[in-house]
Amino acid sequence: MKVGIVIYSNDPETVWNAFRFGNYAVKEGETVQVFLIGKGVESESLDTWAFKITGQMRSFVEGGGAIAACETCLTIHHLGGSEQRWHIRRRGHAPRAAPR
């Protein structure tokens, strides 16, 4: 099964739980893609003492998950040049289907 997760929030708990779900699905053998849009493109900067989001993101990508982000949203939120975004594919306004 293919699973798509859209993250439109910059609430640390919400984003952390979305990536936890993504990690679970990847471990179950599902093909999973996360699409960051709107405030969701801020995900890498939302770590707190309780919610280690970048750790969840790293596990997700290392497990085979894919992360894409709205390029326009990255620009609006001034996040286009971050070196930490090595694992985020830039997309237009909508994600494309993952190759088979």
Region locations from a protein language model:
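Conserved active-site and cofactor/substrate-binding residues in soluble primary-metabolism enzymes
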Residues: 13-17, 52-55
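Mid-chain, well-packed structural core segment of small domains
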Residues: 49, 53-92
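Low-complexity intrinsically disordered segments
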Residues: 96-98
